[in-house]
A protein has these predicted regions:
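N-terminal active-site segment of His-dependent metallophosphoesterases
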Residues: 1-86
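Extended active-site neighborhood of metal-dependent phosphoesterases/phosphodiesterases
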Residues: 9-15, 79-205, 251, 294-297, ...
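Loop/turn elements at helix/coil->beta-strand transitions in domains of secreted/extracellular proteins
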Residues: 27-30, 63-67, 98-104, 167-170, ...
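Active-site-proximal beta-strand elements of phosphoester/diester hydrolases
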Residues: 28-41, 168-182, 221, 299-306, ...
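Divalent metal-coordination and catalytic microenvironments
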Residues: 36, 68, 73, 108, ...
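Active-site environment of divalent metal-dependent phosphoester hydrolases
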Residues: 40-42, 76-79, 105-117, 179-184, ...
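Active-site-proximal segments of metal-dependent phosphoesterases and phosphodiesterases across multiple
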Residues: 85, 178-203, 211-280
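Conserved beta-sheet core of the metallophosphoesterase superfamily
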Residues: 234-341
Length: 363
């Protein structure tokens, strides 16, 4: 599917971003993060996404962008139709194929469409409207299949990792909506709309595959924020295990953890002794506003403002400002372009669209 023409207002915004974008460091990592797009097939969103891709392609020509990450809630799921949800996902994928850099997706809580399965006034969901992981994988997550250093977990799991050799950095893409699909009659025991967490399978993959033989620096990206108090985000099953694994990895320690649970059980051993690692940041979306701070596990955590329409929900960020979001203007979206310099150990984000640039004080 061809992009719509590059809007004049978006060209001006791209030029302003290009002027502010620092020269990419010799060993630097640069990536774009577009979260909570809530895409649907209307002209307004086709234009906004076309402008985003035109912008990133133009910036990529002069200042290489290593990848574009869609941070979950990639599709809007506003029609209560499974077929329309899948069609929107396919159109989104077709537009993203115009990007000149690798595109990697993570899953958000709106992406399986289970919100339309909910029994009235409850968070209990019947089966019928949900879009399973394998369909999401085949449409959106295969966009990364041509990326040389991307390693999917396999078996159509919606997580993987990407190595950036020139930056001595790995980026781990987690699935924070990784709940098992179990039916109790016609009721889903867990639904991805309101239930968050990590199965034992994903945690074991993290400890013994994604973090095995890792380079010095490792970023984590998922949909749900890692910092839960400031963002008022929902609790996640096995979040404590995720944090235990991550701390042991960073500190160069061994671990053996287990949990006896029918659906979220695990028994994981890993040995990270002999080398410590740096985790510059753990990055998420979901809350629809910009934030940063130290998360409960002691790591630096960042969220990025939603990239979708105003009626998807705008909120005040850390600076107390409600930024504009107006269609067919330079504020129609928000995309962070992160630049990490491992030599100087600095991390900045340059904002395309609504919001401001940020200079993070990483540890």
């Amino acid at each position: 599917m061809e992009l719509l023409p590059f809007s004049d207002y978006a060209k001006k915004e791209m030029e302003a971003v290009s002027a502010r974008l620092s020269q990419k460091p010799p060993h630097g990592l640069r990536f774009a993060f577009l979260t909570d797009l809530h895409y649907k097939f209307i002209t307004e969103m086709r234009q906004s996404l076309s402008n985003i891709i035109h912008t990133l392609n133009a910036l990529h020509e002069t200042n290489a962008i290593d990848f574009l990450c869609l941070g979950g809630d990639n599709v809007g799921n506003y029609p209560n139709s499974r077929e329309e949800h899948i069609a929107m996902m396919q159109e989104l994928a077709d537009l993203l194929k115009n990007a000149k850099m690798p595109v990697i997706c993570v899953q958000g809580n709106h992406d399986d469409n289970s919100i339309h399965c909910a029994i009235e006034n409850t968070h209990t969901c019947k089966t019928g409207f949900e879009v399973p992981d394998d369909i999401q994988h085949d449409i959106l997550f295969t966009l990364a299949s041509g990326c040389e250093h991307y390693h999917p977990a396999g078996n159509k799991a919606l997580y993987g990792y990407l190595d950036i050799p020139h930056a001595d950095t790995r980026v781990v893409f987690l699935n924070s909506s990784n709940v098992p699909y179990i039916l109790d009659g016609d009721i889903m025991r867990y639904n991805q709309q309101w239930d968050f967490g990590y199965t034992g399978k994903q945690l074991d993959w993290l400890a013994n595959t994604a973090l095995k033989n890792a380079p010095k620096n490792v970023f984590f990206i998922e949909h749900s924020p890692f910092e839960t108090k400031r963002t008022l985000s929902e609790p996640k099953e096995n979040e404590d295990a995720l944090n235990t694994i991550t701390r042991a990895f960073a500190n160069g320690e061994s671990l053996h953890i287990s949990r006896n649970h029918a659906d979220f059980g695990y028994d994981i051993a890993a040995d990270f002794r002999g080398k410590t690692h740096s985790i510059p940041a753990r990055i998420g979306g979901h809350c629809h506003f910009d934030s940063c701070g130290i998360d409960p596990a002691g790591f630096f955590s960042i969220t990025t403002m939603l990239g979708g329409r105003k009626n998807s929900g705008m909120h005040v960020g850390d600076d107390g400002v409600m930024y504009p979001r107006e269609r067919y203007t330079e504020t129609e979206t928000s995309v962070d372009i992160f630049t990490f310099d491992p030599d100087e150990y600095t991390l900045i984000s340059t904002r395309y669209g609504s919001g401001v640039d940020r200079n993070f004080k990483i540890q």
